[in-house]
Amino acid sequence: MANKLTLSKSKINTFIECPRKFKYRYIDEITEEANEYMLLGTEVHEIAEEIAIELMEGNEIEDVFLNLEYDEELEDHIKGLNKFFKDIYSNGYEIFSIEEYIVDEESNMNGIVDIVIKNSRDELIIFDYKTGKPRNIDKYKLELCVYKILLESKYLDLNVVSAGIYFTSSAAYRIANFGSHSGDYFKSQSKEDIDDSDFDYVDAVVDNLYETIDMNYFKKEKGFLCRYCFYKDMCDGDFG
């Protein structure tokens, strides 16, 4: 494992989207310029972290949001974050960690987990913020599996029972459960589960990714998204 590229959910998702794009970004290390959507995501994540820190220090939610400074175009995202943190505290949860960077040498993965909350039974629930429109949880199961692997590799005595996406602009949840657990506010919003087959899929993609690196052949996944790709011009000039 020591000689292999350390993976993250972003690297794995990029490989699934297009192996050639993966090569440009992570093998050739050609940095993609930040677009408006990336900048928005960064700004909302920073504000969410600021809010969480204030709340963990014992400040009241109303006071935190009253004193919050932000641009007007972020209004919907701020309203969404307000609901999210109220849901946490009004339903008996506490914030366990925020923006935690974890490295798991066994799986050869790393990543930053946006926020983890804990219920009264010391069970953990992972959330990842998204600033786009709500989408089906199936799109995000892979990265939620990665987050569970990372978190449980560090906190060996704790169990991650659920993981979800929170869409800040629409205050919408998409949550999946790792097995069954009862009596949770966030579980009641979900009818989805993540099972062994989802983790098997992660393993299969990772194996394919490393095989592709070893063969040094990164095929193009041609489709309508190509026209928006940062690497389009150089990709069009490549053969294969």
Each language-model region and where it sits:
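Catalytic cores of nuclease domains that cleave nucleic-acid phosphodiester backbones
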Residues: E50-R135, L142, K154-G164, Y173
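Short, polar/flexible loop-turn hinges at active-site or ligand-entry regions and domain interfaces
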Residues: I30-Y37, K133-N136, N216
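Nuclease catalytic cores
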Residues: L5, K9-M56, E99-E100, Y228-Y231
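Short amphipathic alpha-helical face segments that pack within enzyme cores
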Residues: E43, L142-L150
